[in-house]
Swiss-Prot record:
Organism lineage string: Bacteria, Thermotogati, Thermotogota, Thermotogae, Thermotogales
Gene Ontology cellular component terms for the protein in this record: cytoplasm
Record-listed Zn(2+) binding positions: C250, C255, H257, C263
Provenance organism: Thermotoga maritima (strain ATCC 43589 / DSM 3109 / JCM 10099 / NBRC 100826 / MSB8)
Pfam families in UniProt: RsgA_GTPase (PF03193), RsgA_N (PF16745)
Protein name from the UniProt record: Small ribosomal subunit biogenesis GTPase RsgA
Cofactor needs: Zn(2+)
Location in or out of the cell: Cytoplasm
Residues that hold GTP according to the record: N117, K118, M119, D120, G170, L171, S172, G173, V174, G175, K176, S177, S178
Gene, per the UniProt record: rsgA
């Protein structure tokens, strides 16, 4: 008799794993079969697994099913999309940080929804910065403007979240936890105030966990990241993660769009088809990666 069931990993507790049964929705505390340690097999939040329940109400994870993807920073499996939360103050998210997040999402073949949060706090100068972000990114990614305090944009954001596994991304202090509380009050996530002096929130989550929305779908709430590493990307690979570069015609088929002549990307920047900030951030990342490789 096959007692194995299937579920999804929603959280970790020391050496135990919480699995949500895919049929019943029941959450089972499971330990790992010995082969995971012996074969150094890894398991992550978002993994779909086979487990065997026991008579005590706990279970044992037998196998990890095929992963469609795996994010490494943070470690999350089978993600459908990234919800990138940015703010123009307290803290300000630079376009360079935004573009690093987007490069990582593109590398992992993930859809991205950009959320400009804390709209209730912005004065006219801040709103000008919001419009600048919209000008740069609206043709590339969906943008939702939100306020957890007033409810602005919350229903629109819910539509993007329904039925999918999403991961929140963004600097600490941009209001990821507050947004999730506004989207689904039952989540009851802790919220930290942003220090005005540091303009950087204290992390309110310490390990990744999968949270289930009442309206369907999951989200992984993970710590905000001040530093984003793209070290495993080759300099020549980087251009593929700036989606607006793809259809530009260059004289050289292997053009890196930096110092080559007759470059379609540089021409597109000059005539306004590609945002200057996007290109400048690309060049900065390219040389960072090139310098790291030479060390």
């Amino acid at each position: 008799m096959n007692l194995r069931r299937r579920g999804i990993v929603v959280s970790f507790h020391s050496n135990m794993v919480t699995v949500e049964d895919e049929e019943t929705g029941e959450r089972i505390l499971c330990k790992l079969r010995g082969k995971f340690r012996l074969q150094n097999l890894k398991i992550y939040v978002g993994d779909r697994v086979e487990y065997t329940p026991d008579e005590t109400g706990s279970g044992v994870i037998e196998n990890v099913l095929h992963r469609k993807n795996l994010l490494t920073k943070p470690h999350v499996a089978n993600v459908d999309q990234v919800i990138l939360v940015v703010t123009v103050k307290m803290p300000e998210t630079s376009t360079y940080i935004i573009d690093k997040f987007l490069v990582l999402a593109e590398k992992n073949e993930l859809e991205t929804v950009m959320v400009i949060n804390k709209m209730d706090l912005y004065d006219e100068d801040d709103l000008r910065k919001v419009r600048e972000l919209e000008e740069i990114y609206s043709g590339l990614y969906p943008i939702v403007k939100t306020s957890a305090k007033t409810g602005m944009g919350i229903e629109e954001l819910k539509e993007y979240l329904k039925g999918k596994i999403s991961t929140m991304a963004g600097l600490s202090g941009v209001g990821k936890s507050s947004l999730l509380n506004a989207i689904n009050p039952g989540l009851k996530l802790r919220v930290s105030e942003v220090s005005e002096k540091l303009q950087r929130g204290r992390h309110t989550t310490t390990t990744a966990q999968l949270l289930k929305f009442d309206f369907g779908g999951y989200v992984v709430d993970t710590p905000g990241f001040a530093n984003l590493e793209i070290n495993d990307i080759e300099p020549e690979e980087l251009k593929h993660y700036f989606k607006e570069f793809g259809d530009k015609q260059c004289f050289f088929s292997d053009c890196n769009h930096v110092d080559e002549p007759e470059c379609g990307v540089k021409e597109a920047v000059e005539n306004g088809e590609i945002a200057e900030s996007r290109y400048e951030n690309y060049v900065k990342m390219f040389y960072e990666l090139l310098g790291r490789r030479k060390k």
